[in-house]
Amino acid sequence: MASGAVNAIKIILQLLLFPVMARLLGPDEFGLYALALPTVALIALLADGGLGATLAREDESSELVWSSAFWALMFLGITLALCSAGFGLVLGYLAKQPRLYGIIGLLSLSLVFMTLSVVPAARLARRKQLGVGAAADLTANLIGAAIAVAMAWRGSGAWSLAAQYLVIYAIRAVLLNCAAFHRPRAVFSFGALRHHLVSGGAMIAIRISDYAGRLVENFLINRMFGTTLLGSYTFGNQVSKVATEAASNVIWAALYVQALTGERSQIVILHRRLCRMLGIALFPATFLAAAAAPEIVSLLLGPKWIGLTFFLQVFLPTYAFSVVSCQTAPILMAYGRIDIFFWCVFGLSLGRVLAVGLGWWLGLDGAVCGIALVTLVFCVAMLLVPAEVTGCHVLPVLRGLAGPAISAVLASGCYLVIVNVFGADITSMCAGLAGGLVAYGLSMILIDRRQLGEDFSVARRIISRPASREPVRSFEPANRPNAL
C-alpha cells in the first residue's frame, strides 16, 4: 500500500512539474538535457551490477556476501562515474554542445549515490520494511523537485534538471543508509557474488538495449533536426512514457509476485483481468489527452512548445498499448524465460533507431509515425510470442480490451465535437474533457456492463484482502465458476 501511494504521489508530482519546468526552460534547454541524461542513464544500468534484484534473498548473517557486495558496488560506482564523465567530453565534442560535458559530469556523481543505495535497500526489502524505502523515495523526489524549480526560476537552464536528478539519488542514499546501514567487513569474494551477478544479468541486458537505442535516437534527432526539435520530441516522449509506465508499475509487481507462487491457470486469469483494468484506466486518459493536446500545450506551455502537440498525439496512445502488452514480461521473469522479453525489447530498440534514421527522408513527423508503427509491432510480439510459455493467449486479452478501446475513441470524438462547436478556450476544453469522460462511462455501460461488474468484484477482493504470503487462489468473481 505504501509503495502504491508513493507511486500515485510521484505521478501527480511529475504531471505538475512537467509544465512548470517546460515554461521556465523551453525546448532548447530540454534538448540539451536530453543529450546528457541518456548517457548517464545507460551507464546507470550497470550501477547495481545485477545485485539489486537478488541481494534481498541473501540472509543477513552471510557477512561475506553482504560485505563483498558493498565493496564491489563502491568500486563499480566510482569507476562508472569516471567513465561517464570522460564520455561526456567525447559526446560534447561530437554534438557541438560545449555545456554538455559539465552537465554530464554533474549527472555522473549520481552513479556513486546509486551504488550506495543498493545494499541498504536490499536489507530493507529483506526485512519487509518497504514503507521506509517508499518514504525515502518520496522525500527525495519532493526535495529534488523544489531545487529544480528554484534553480530554473533563477535562470540555470538545463543545470536545474541535472541538479534535480543528482539530488534525488543523493537524498535517497542518505536516508536509506540512515535506516539500514551496516558496517561492512574488510573482506571480498567474487565467488560469493557469482550467482547474484548471473541472475541479474538478463535484466541489465534488457535495460541496456532500451537505453542504448534511445541514446542513438536522441543523437540522430539532434544532428538532423537540431536541439529545439529534440527538446520537444524528448519532452513528449518522456511525458507519455513516465505517465503510462508509472500507472502500470503496481500491476507489474502484483503479477510478478503472484506468478512466483500461484497456480498457472489462475495467473492466466489474473493477467487478463489486470490488463483489462489497466486499459480501463489508461485508454480514456491517454486518448483524451491526445485529443486535447493542442489546447493543453497552448494554454499551459505557450507558443514556443507548439511542436510538442504532434508528439503527444502519437506517443500517448501508443505507450498506453505498449505498457498493457508488456504485462506478460513479469510472468516471463517468474517462469525463467526473460530471454523472450529481451529479444522483443532488442527488436523494438533497433526498429526505433531505423525509424528515426528514415527521418532524413521523411522528416521528424514521419520518423515519429515510424516509431509508433514499430512500437505496435512490439505490442503484437509481446502478446503472441510469450503465449505458449505463459498460457496468456491473445484473443481473451483483446476481447477484454475491446470495450475500453472503443469507448476511449468515442470519448475523444466527443471532446473534439465540443471544442469545434464552442471554441478552444479553457472553458470549452474543460467541458470537452468532462463530456468525453461521461461519453466513455456511458459507452462502457452500454457495451461492457457485465464485464464492468466482474471487474469491480475482483478489484474489491484484491484490495480488501489482508496482507498474506499465500497467493490468491481465484481471481474470478465469487458468483461464477472459474473459466478461461
Put a short name on every predicted segment:
Residues 384-387, 392, 413-484:
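Membrane-proximal transmembrane or re-entrant/amphipathic helices at the cytosolic face
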Residues 12, 71-96, 101-106, 146-154, ...:
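Alpha-helical transmembrane segments of multi-pass membrane transport and lipid-handling proteins
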Residues 14, 44-63, 125-126, 236, ...:
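Helix-loop junctions and terminal segments of transmembrane helices
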Residues 101-108, 136-182, 198-201, 235-237, ...:
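Hydrophobic alpha-helical transmembrane segments
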Residues 1-49, 76-88, 140-149, 164-172, ...:
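Signature of the first transmembrane helix
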Residues 131, 135, 174-215, 254-269, ...:
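Interhelical loop/hinge segments that connect adjacent transmembrane helices in multipass membrane
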Residues 54-63, 112-136, 159, 180, ...:
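Membrane-interface junctions at transmembrane-helix termini in multi-pass inner-membrane proteins
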